């Protein structure tokens, strides 16, 4: 039966600085690198043999996947990168300090932007420092200027169906190294989590989430490999 392993990237510099990161290509901290390697060690210790890695086009996710595979002694695994696995686009909040933004707009409003399912932050103004339209990794793509979790799901799900699911249906073990919200979108889809509950699902950094699937890609079991840093999981079935 197919197995899916979800791995949220390790701590990034802007995680450390408490800034809205979104699509900004921030690298891992030393702690983030250690988290990624630990994730790979856990995968190896569990006897999991990865057949393919999918990741975003953002450095922190790419490096997390590569470091994990290297630590698991599986660096030969094919890797596919796609922007549709990117983190949620935080629009006009991109680059801002979260605490300072809450002081300016109020905690309630910022909480709505961050944690509501279908209310996005203000749009990113074109031509600014964080305008990604001229970044060559997105050449030919129709890019968002802001996203909610709902629109992140709309972006991620077609890629899941067209590119990732066929490998799982073929019985492969797939690792996805990505971001909190793109992984949350996949969890919502697989476990059919209600809209008002998915925003409360937390995915810890660097802790592999192993999901056992049946032939129809319905979850039959799920577990974090590091129990000490595990978060609550949606119910299976």
Swiss-Prot record:
Pathway: Carbohydrate degradation; glycolysis; pyruvate from D-glyceraldehyde 3-phosphate: step 3/5. The record marks 179 as: Transition state stabilizer. Gene3D superfamilies: Phosphoglycerate mutase-like (3.40.50.1240). Substrate binds at residues 8-15, 21-22, 60, 87-90, 98, 114-115, 180-181. GO terms for molecular function: phosphoglycerate mutase activity. InterPro entries: His_Pase_superF_clade-1 (IPR013078), His_PPase_superfam (IPR029033), PG/BPGM_mutase_AS (IPR001345), Phosphogly_mut1 (IPR005952). It catalyses: (2R)-2-phosphoglycerate = (2R)-3-phosphoglycerate. The keyword Isomerase applies. Its EC number is 5.4.2.11. It holds the Pfam family His_Phos_1. Homodimer. Catalyzes the interconversion of 2-phosphoglycerate and 3-phosphoglycerate. Belongs to the phosphoglycerate mutase family. BPG-dependent PGAM subfamily. This is 2,3-bisphosphoglycerate-dependent phosphoglycerate mutase. It comes from Caulobacter vibrioides (strain NA1000 / CB15N) (Caulobacter crescentus).
């Amino acid at each position: 039966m197919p197995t899916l392993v979800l791995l949220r990237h390790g701590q990034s510099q802007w995680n450390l600085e408490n800034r809205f990161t979104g699509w900004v290509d921030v690298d891992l901290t030393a702690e983030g690198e250690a988290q990624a390697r630990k994730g790979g060690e856990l995968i190896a210790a569990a006897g999991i043999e990865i057949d393919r890695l999918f990741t975003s086009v953002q450095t922190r996710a790419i490096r997390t996947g590569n470091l994990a595979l290297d630590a698991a002694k599986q660096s030969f695994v094919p890797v596919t990168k796609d922007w549709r696995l990117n983190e949620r686009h935080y629009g006009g909040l991109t680059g801002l300090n979260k605490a300072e933004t809450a002081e300016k707009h109020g905690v309630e409003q910022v909480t709505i932007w961050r944690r509501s399912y279908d209310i996005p932050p203000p749009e990113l103004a074109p031509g600014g420092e964080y305008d990604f339209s001229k970044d060559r990794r997105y050449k030919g793509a129709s890019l968002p200027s802001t996203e909610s979790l709902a629109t992140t799901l709309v972006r991620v799900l077609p890629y899941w169906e067209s590119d990732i699911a066929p490998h799982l249906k073929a019985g492969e073990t797939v690792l996805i190294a990505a971001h909190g919200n793109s992984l949350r979108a996949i969890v919502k889809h697989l476990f059919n989590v209600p809209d008002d509950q998915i925003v409360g699902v937390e995915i810890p950094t660097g802790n592999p989430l192993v999901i056992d699937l049946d032939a129809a890609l319905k979850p039959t079991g799920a577990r974090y490999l590091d129990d000490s840093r595990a978060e609550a999981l949606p119910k299976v079935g």
